[in-house]
């Protein structure tokens, strides 16, 4: 089979299984509403949980950061570590209660940590529902990967405590699972890993900013401080990028051995300025978190009497389970015809038979937006 044949066969299989992905060109930002062509939609597909991507202070901070120019021209190990980057790292570490924070490009944070830390003989205990960046890295690094059923403390205990391991063990999970909207039992997981002399790494992409005191996230909410915490900035922060929170020695180790960090151009300083402004708004953002919770409650209460199959989620992620790929696409199309932008999620992002509409609620949504969503969902589910 030639290269071209292999590529065309893979594309044909995606089309046959109604799993083919297509990008859509939007205009005018990605907030409460989204514009495609000449039509405006209510946006229920974005991760901008607190609406900070459109926040005037965050935008102004980015504009003021233009004094640095539009890019770094190098890695943070060369010329790319500015005063803006340093200030952001220090503020994040102080806020989340860690000695150090290191800035990364979003997807690369998980990849970098696992690639740098894991060696032959080590074992990664990877939650099956973890983000693709974690699972991909877990399968590619030197350590052996041991899949753990989602939220299975019993499964983790069996693998972590009972099976011998020549090297070190690292359990990786998410604070909130991005496709189901539920959370991992972090306190119990950390108790098990500590008892076994293992480390716990938590990617809290969907919890940072919206859970816990001052939005410090899922770990803070559960009274847990994992050895490695990944905070990403593309959700509640409304920007992009990520940070790894850890102890002093681990930070220095990553600076020496994390190739994704060493050999990548650092994020623009203006982005670091915007992230500082977003962090300040998150820390004082009880009003935004309360508004988000109000919208979640309004949706859950309104959906209860409807013929909808929802997961048991009390978060901004509200999956409507459909099962069949084509039916999920058809429902998404009908919602868009009614002015609602909702994405159909299909395998391989979710397991086979797990196609769904992933409804994402934000603090920017208004009460009438939630009511309109419920009205249309009721109509299309008949």
Curated annotation (Swiss-Prot):
Q: What GO molecular functions are on record for this protein?
A: 8-amino-7-oxononanoate synthase activity; pyridoxal phosphate binding
| Binding locations of pyridoxal 5'-phosphate | 178, 206, 232
Q: Which Pfam families match?
A: Aminotran_1_2
Gene Ontology BP annotations: biotin biosynthetic process
InterPro entries (UniProt xref): Aminotrans_II_pyridoxalP_BS (IPR001917), Aminotransferase_I/II_large (IPR004839), AON_synthase_class-II (IPR050087), AONS_Proteobacteria (IPR022834), PyrdxlP-dep_Trfase (IPR015424), PyrdxlP-dep_Trfase_major (IPR015421), PyrdxlP-dep_Trfase_small (IPR015422)
Name the catalysed reactions.
6-carboxyhexanoyl-[ACP] + L-alanine + H(+) = (8S)-8-amino-7-oxononanoate + holo-[ACP] + CO2
Q: Which Gene3D superfamilies match?
A: Aspartate Aminotransferase, domain 1, Type I PLP-dependent aspartate aminotransferase-like (Major domain)
According to its UniProt record, the EC number is 2.3.1.47
Annotated residues for binding of substrate: 21, 131, 349
The UniProt keyword set, sorted, is:
Biotin biosynthesis, Pyridoxal phosphate, Transferase
Q: Does the keyword Repressor apply?
A: no
N6-(pyridoxal phosphate)lysine modifications at = 235
- Pathway assigned to this chain's UniProt record: Cofactor biosynthesis; biotin biosynthesis
Q: Which cofactors are named for this entry?
A: pyridoxal 5'-phosphate
Assembly and binders: Homodimer.
> What PANTHER family is this protein classified in?
8-AMINO-7-OXONONANOATE SYNTHASE, CLASS II AMINOTRANSFERASE/8-AMINO-7-OXONONANOATE SYNTHASE
Q: Which family does it belong to?
A: Belongs to the class-II pyridoxal-phosphate-dependent aminotransferase family. BioF subfamily.
Instruction: Name the job this protein performs.
Output: Catalyzes the decarboxylative condensation of pimeloyl-[acyl-carrier protein] and L-alanine to produce 8-amino-7-oxononanoate (AON), [acyl-carrier protein], and carbon dioxide.
Listed name of the protein: 8-amino-7-oxononanoate synthase
Q: What is the lineage of its organism?
A: Bacteria, Pseudomonadati, Pseudomonadota, Gammaproteobacteria, Enterobacterales
């Amino acid at each position: 089979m030639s290269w071209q044949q292999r590529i065309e066969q893979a594309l044909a299989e995606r089309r046959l299984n109604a799993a083919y992905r297509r990008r859509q060109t939007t205009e005018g930002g990605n907030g409460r509403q989204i514009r495609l062509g000449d039509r405006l939609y209510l946006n229920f597909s974005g991760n901008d949980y607190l609406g900070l991507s459109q926040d005037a202070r965050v935008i102004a901070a980015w504009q003021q950061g233009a004094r640095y120019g539009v890019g770094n021209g190098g890695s943070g190990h060369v010329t790319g570590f500015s005063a803006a980057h340093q200030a952001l790292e220090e503020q994040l570490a102080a806020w989340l209660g860690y000695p150090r924070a290191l800035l990364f490009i979003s997807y690369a944070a998980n990849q970098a940590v696992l690639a740098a830390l894991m060696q032959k003989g080590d074992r990664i205990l990877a939650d099956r529902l973890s983000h693709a960046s974690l699972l991909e890295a877990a399968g590619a690094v030197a350590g052996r990967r041991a899949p753990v059923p989602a939220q299975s403390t019993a499964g983790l205990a069996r693998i972590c405590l009972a099976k011998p391991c020549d090297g070190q063990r690292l359990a990786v999970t998410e604070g909130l699972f991005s496709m189901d909207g539920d959370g991992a039992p972090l306190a119990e997981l950390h108790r098990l890993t500590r008892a076994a002399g293992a480390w716990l790494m938590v990617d809290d992409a969907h919890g940072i900013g919206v859970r816990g005191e001052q939005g410090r996230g899922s770990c803070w909410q559960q009274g847990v401080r994992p050895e490695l915490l990944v905070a990403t900035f593309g959700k509640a922060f409304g920007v992009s990028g990520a940070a790894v929170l850890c102890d002093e020695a681990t930070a220095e180790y990553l600076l020496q051995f994390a190739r994704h960090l060493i050999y990548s151009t650092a994020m623009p300083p203006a982005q670091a300025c915007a992230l500082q402004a977003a962090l300040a708004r998150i820390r004082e953002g009880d009003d935004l978190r309360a508004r988000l919770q109000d919208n979640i409650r309004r949706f859950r209460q309104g959906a209860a009497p409807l013929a909808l199959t929802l997961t048991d989620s009390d978060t901004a992620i509200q999956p409507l389970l459909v099962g069949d790929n084509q039916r999920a696409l058809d429902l998404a199309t009908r919602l868009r015809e009614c002015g609602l932008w909702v994405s159909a999620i299909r395998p391989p992002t979710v397991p086979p038979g797990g196609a769904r509409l992933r409804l994402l609620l934000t603090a920017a949504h208004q009460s009438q937006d939630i009511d309109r969503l419920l009205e249309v969902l009721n109509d299309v589910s008949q």
